[in-house]
Amino acid sequence: MAFKLWLLDEETIYEHVFERYTQLEGQSGKLAQDLGIQDRRGGVLEITFEPSGLEGGRKKKRVRRRNKASSVEEDQNVAVDSYHVSVGQSISSLHSSRDNGNSTTGYVLWSTTPFFINWLLYSTSAAPFRLGSQVEVTCGSSCEGHMLELPRLIDLTGADRGKRGILELGAGISGILPVILGNFVDTYVSTDQKGILNKLKDNIMENLSQLTRKRCISRSLRLELPTVEPVGDADITAASLPSKSTLHLEVAALDWEKINLQDKKTHSLHPELSLIGETCSSVYVIAMDVIYNEYLIDPFLKTLKQLKHWLQTTYNLQFHVLVGIHLRSQEVTTLFLEKAIIEYDLTVYDIVDQVIQESRFNFYLIT
C-alpha cells in the first residue's frame, strides 16, 4: 500500500509531533539511541544497497560487486539494481573548531540518507515517487480528504519523456545520493558550503561507477562525454552509437545565509541552479538531516522560498521538497513545522508510512 499524506496546519502540528515522539518512546528498546552518525569508527565506510523483501516471494538473482552496480530483472514498481559505495569521511573534522567555519556536521555520513535511499528505491509504499501518481491526503483529523498528484521523483524505466531534476541542499561529503539517484533523473545538482565540496567531489568520483544507467557530464567535476574514434573507413559519431541517456551532474556551493535570487546579478553566481530550470520540467529539492538545531531553520526556509519562487516564475517548473529529519529534539521539530507553515506559508505534508514510523526518521513533503 502506498504512503499517505497528512496535511499539517496550525492546529495539527502539535498533534502530529506528539504522536510521532510518543511512537518513538514506545520503540526505544528497538531503535538505536544515538545522534545518527552512520559509523563513527572508520574513515572509509563500505555500504551496500540492494532489494530485499520483494513481493510475492519472487527470487531474483543478486550480484554484489565492489564498485560496480548490478542490474537484474526490470520492475516498474520497485528498483532492482544493487549498489555498493565507499564513503570517505573525516571524524577529526567533525570535532574540529577550525574546519569550514566551525560548521562540521557535513564531514560524516548521517543515517537519514541511507534509510531514505533504501525506502525510496525498494519499499513498495514509496511507489508514488517512482511512478508518479495520485496520493491520498488527509486534512487534519477529518477522514475526508482529497488526492494529490505527484510527479515522479525518479524514473526507473527511462521511458518517461518528462525531464526531471534533483537539487540537493546540505549534501555533506558522502555523495551517495547523486551517484545512486542520478541513474533515474536528467539533472542533479548537489550543494553545500564551500568547505565541504572537495571531499564531496572526491566521494562522487570514487563511486562514479554506480552510475550504470547514465553517461555523466559535469563542468564542476570536469567530466565530458567520451570522443568516438573512426573505425575503418566509417565516420562514426557518438550520436550514431547506441548509448545511455545523459545525466548533468554538478556540485556547487550554496550558502543559505547569503543566497539572494531576487538580485539578478547573483544569478550568474549560481549557473547550476539555472541548469535545472533550463533542462527540467519538474524538480525535487532533497534535504536530508539538515534540521538539527534552531539556528538553521530560518536560513533553510528562506532558501526554499526563494528557490520555489524563482524556479516557478522563471521556468514554470513543478516544484516539490522532501525534507528528512532524524527525530532528536522535539522542540526543534516543532519549531521547524511552526515556522514552515505559519511564518513562511508553505504547504507541509507528513508522509505517513509504516516503515518510516518504525524508524527514528520522519519525512515531509513541502509544496
Curated annotation (Swiss-Prot):
Any one Gene Ontology cellular component term annotated for this protein: cytosol
Known EC number: 2.1.1.-
Ranges of biased composition (kind: Basic residues): 58-68
Gene Ontology BP term (one): methylation
Enzyme class: transferase
Chain positions covered by the region annotation Disordered: 55-74
GO MF: S-adenosylmethionine-dependent methyltransferase activity
Keyword terms of this UniProt record: Methyltransferase, S-adenosyl-L-methionine, Transferase
Chain positions recorded as S-adenosyl-L-methionine binding sites: 110, 170-172, 192, 256, 288
InterPro entries (UniProt xref): Methyltransf_16, SAM-dependent_MTases_sf
Keyword hit for Repeat: no
Record family assignment: Belongs to the class I-like SAM-binding methyltransferase superfamily. RKM5 family.
Role, per record: S-adenosyl-L-methionine-dependent protein-lysine N-methyltransferase that monomethylates 60S ribosomal protein L1 (RPL1A and RPL1B) at 'Lys-46'.
Listed name of the protein: Ribosomal lysine N-methyltransferase 5
Organism name: Saccharomyces cerevisiae (strain AWRI796) (Baker's yeast)
Originating gene: RKM5
